[in-house]
């Protein structure tokens, strides 16, 4: 049952659906959405029945057009704002989820929207999607992980061009840059995303989780260290009988 104001959370079989639900405001990320996402992501993480999650935006115009700066820049004090952010580390929670997360991206994918998408494991874009990081032009830095996740996806030069100039990429440019996995017509966005989710959900949950863990953790290791990690995780998989 959905009891949130800025999100819709549903489970169908073993697939979790998280929908950013502020369509009149282009699904911009505000304080309430942060708190509700923190709660929902924790529920997904702790639910053994969830094999994969889909993240999408409500409405026709945007996945997420950024953050609501009127809220985040008017906190009672910078100290309180930082403390609350540390206590509700939504981005860290995204990155630590054991289940794969697939982002279905349409319309505006800007600011916190692109940073949220970059925390997902697979990104499917509709042909009308636009990607950008306008924060520098607003006098702030992309502090929701954009300076770290974007260059890891598209490389240093392309990331700096986007971050320092605010240049937007259309869907095909994003695909060529490696920012998204596929580009599909708008009407095929959710069906394509669900097809991928169902494929993943058809496999052993443990094997999927271990494969994700080995891949992501291995990126920060040397090749030899990564191979050792892979062996340890495969042994764990065999011991548990999967």
Question: What is each PLM-predicted segment?
Answer:
Residues 15-19, 54-56, 76, 102-104, ...:
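Structural motif
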């Amino acid at each position: 049952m959905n009891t949130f104001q800025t999100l819709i959370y549903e489970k169908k079989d073993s697939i979790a659906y998280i929908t950013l639900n502020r369509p009149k405001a282009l699904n911009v990320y505000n304080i309430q959405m942060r708190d509700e996402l923190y709660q929902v992501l924790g529920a997904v993480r702790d639910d053994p029945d969830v094999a994969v999650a889909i993240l999408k935006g409500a409405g026709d115009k945007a996945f997420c057009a950024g953050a609501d700066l009127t809220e985040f820049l008017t906190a009672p004090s910078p100290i309180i704002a930082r403390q609350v952010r540390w206590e509700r580390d939504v981005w860290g929670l995204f990155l630590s989820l054991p289940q794969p997360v697939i982002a279905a991206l349409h319309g505006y994918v800007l600011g916190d929207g692109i940073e949220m998408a970059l925390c997902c494991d697979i990104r499917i874009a509709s042909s009308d999607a636009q990607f950008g990081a306008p924060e520098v032009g607003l006098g702030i830095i992309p502090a929701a992980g954009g300076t770290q996740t974007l260059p890891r996806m598209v490389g240093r030069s392309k990331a700096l061009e986007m971050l320092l100039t605010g240049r937007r990429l259309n869907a095909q440019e994003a695909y060529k840059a490696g920012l998204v996995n596929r580009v599909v017509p708008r009407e095929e966005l959710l069906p394509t995303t669900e097809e991928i989710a169902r494929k993943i959900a058809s496999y052993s949950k443990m094997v999927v989780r271990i494969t994700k863990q080995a891949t992501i953790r291995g990126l920060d290791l040397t090749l030899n260290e990564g191979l050792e990690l892979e062996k340890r995780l495969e042994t764990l998989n065999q011991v548990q009988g999967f």
